[in-house]
A protein has these predicted regions:
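Structural core segment of the AMP-binding/adenylate-forming
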Residues: 36, 75-76, 103-178
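A short helix-loop-beta submotif of the ANL/AMP-binding
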Residues: 82-83, 89-117, 125-131, 145, ...
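Conserved AMP-binding/adenylation subdomain of ANL enzymes
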Residues: 222-239, 247-287, 297, 301-302
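Gly/Ser/Thr-rich phosphate-binding loop
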Residues: 260, 285-290, 299-344
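Conserved AMP-binding/adenylate-forming core of the ANL superfamily
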Residues: 46-91, 95-99, 116-121, 172-177
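Flexible, low-complexity linker/hinge segments
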Residues: 22-31, 143, 163-198
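Conserved pre-ATP/AMP-binding loop-to-beta segment of ANL
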Residues: 45-48, 156-157, 174-203, 210, ...
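Conserved structural elements of the adenylate-forming
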Residues: 63-69, 181-186, 195, 200, ...
C-alpha cells in the first residue's frame, strides 16, 4: 500500500518537471556527427587525419578544407535541404564531402561507382541533385547519364593528381581544388536546427525496379557512428585503411566515426591486394572493413604479396558470411575478423 501511495505521489509531482524546463541553448544541442570534426579540430589539430599517396592532411587542415568547400557551395546557390551528389573513389574528396556538404545544410548523396548511366540518371533526377562532384575517370558513364537530365546540375571534377587521368576528359565547369579555394575559411557553417534534419541520401542497388532512396538524419548518423565504435571496441588514434567504398551506406558511417576517434584514415583508390598489404605495413594499420570478396582476395593472395603482419589487425566484414575456410586463412595471417550484418 505504501508503495502505491508513493507511486501516485510521484505521478502528481511529475508536473513540476514540466515547468520552465523546456529545451534551450544552454541544455540542448541537436545531435550531429559534424560536431565530431569540430571537436577533434580543436583538441587534436595537428594529428594526421588523412593520408593518400603523396597527400596528407591534419585534422585542422581537413576542417578548414571542409569549411571552405561548404562556403564555395553556398556561393553557387546551394542551400539547406538541397542534394549534392558525389561519385568518387575512396580519395580524400569523398571523405571531406561527408562534412562539407552538410555544413551548408545540404544532403550528401554518394552514388555507387558501378552503376550504369540509366540508373545514375534516375538517381540524379529522383534526388533533385543541384551539384555533382565526380572523379574524371567516370567521364564516359556520367556524360551519358547527364544526357537526359531535365534540370541544371553544376559539375565539379575531381582531378586526382596521384592517378593517371590524362586519358579522361574534364566533365564540369569546376575543378575540386580550385572550387574549394573560392570558399571562405571563416565561413560560419550551418549546424542543424533539428537533429531530424536529413544529412544523407543513399540508394539501394540490386533491388527490383528503380533504386530506393534511404534518408539518414543527423541524429541517426551520430548514433550510428558512436554505436559502431562501441560494438567494434574501436580505440582512439587507430589507423583505418578505407577499403569499404564510401558510397556504400556512407562507408558504414565511418567517415564520422573516425573523426570522433581522431584516427588516421588511409585512403585506397582501388582494391589491390599488393597495395593493401603494403599500406598495412607502411602505416601500421589497426583496422579495416571489407566485403567477403575482399577477404577472399587477401586470404588467397600470392605468397609474395602477403607481408608478415607486425600486430593483429581488426577486420569487419558484412553481407553474406564468408566460408569458414576464409575465416581460418585470415586468422592464420594475423587478422581478427568480426562478421556483422546491417541495413541501409
Amino acid at each position: 500500500m505504501e508503495v502505491i501511495i508513493l507511486w501516485i505521489l510521484n505521478l502528481i509531482n511529475m508536473s513540476h518537471y514540466d515547468t520552465n524546463l523546456d529545451k534551450n541553448d544552454a541544455n540542448y544541442v541537436p545531435l550531429s556527427p559534424l560536431s565530431f570534426l569540430e571537436r577533434t579540430k580543436n583538441i587534436y589539430p595537428n594529428y594526421e587525419a588523412i593520408v593518400y599517396e603523396s597527400r596528407s592532411y591534419t585534422w585542422s587542415e581537413v576542417y578548414k578544407r571542409c569549411v571552405k568547400f561548404a562556403s564555395a557551395l553556398e556561393k553557387i546557390g546551394v542551400k539547406t535541404g538541397d542534394t549534392v551528389s558525389i561519385m568518387a573513389f575512396n580519395t580524400p574528396e569523398i571523405f571531406e564531402a561527408h562534412y562539407s556538404i552538410p555544413m551548408v545544410g545540404a544532403v550528401i548523396n554518394a552514388i555507387n561507382t558501378r552503376l550504369d548511366p540509366k540508373t545514375i540518371n534516375y538517381i540524379l533526377e529522383h534526388s533533385g541533385a543541384k551539384v555533382l562532384i565526380v572523379d574524371r575517370q567516370f567521364h564516359e558513364v556520367i556524360a551519358k547519364a547527364l544526357e537526359n537530365v531535365k534540370s541544371k546540375i553544376t559539375i565539379i571534377d575531381i582531378d586526382d593528381k596521384d592517378a593517371n587521368l590524362s586519358e579522361y576528359k574534364k566533365i564540369g565547369e569546376h575543378e575540386y581544388e580550385n572550387f574549394l579555394n573560392t570558399g571562405d575559411e571563416n565561413y560560419e557553417w550551418k549546424k542543424p536546427r533539428d537533429e531530424w534534419q536529413a544529412i544523407s541520401l543513399c540508394y539501394t542497388s540490386g533491388t527490383t525496379g528503380n533504386p530506393k532512396g534511404v534518408v539518414y538524419h543527423h541524429r541517426g548518423a551520430y548514433l550510428m557512428a558512436t554505436g559502431s565504435s562501441v560494438a567494434w571496441n574501436m580505440p582512439n588514434k587507430l589507423n583505418f585503411l578505407y577499403t569499404v567504398p564510401m558510397f556504400h551506406c556512407n562507408g558504414w558511417c565511418y567517415p564520422w566515426t573516425l573523426s570522433m576517434l581522431h584516427g588516421r584514415v588511409i585512403c585506397l583508390r582501388n582494391i589491390d591486394v599488393k597495395k593493401i598489404f603494403e599500406l598495412i605495413d607502411k602505416y601500421e594499420v589497426t583496422h579495416f572493413g571489407g566485403a567477403p570478396i575482399v577477404l577472399n582476395m587477401l586470404a588467397n593472395a600470392p605468397k609474395e604479396h602477403q607481408k608478415k603482419l607486425k600486430r593483429k589487425i581488426q577486420v569487419l566484414t558484412a553481407g553474406a558470411p564468408p566460408p569458414s575456410i576464409i575465416f581460418e586463412k585470415m586468422k592464420n595471417l594475423g587478422f581478427d575478423v568480426m562478421h556483422v550484418y546491417g541495413l541501409t
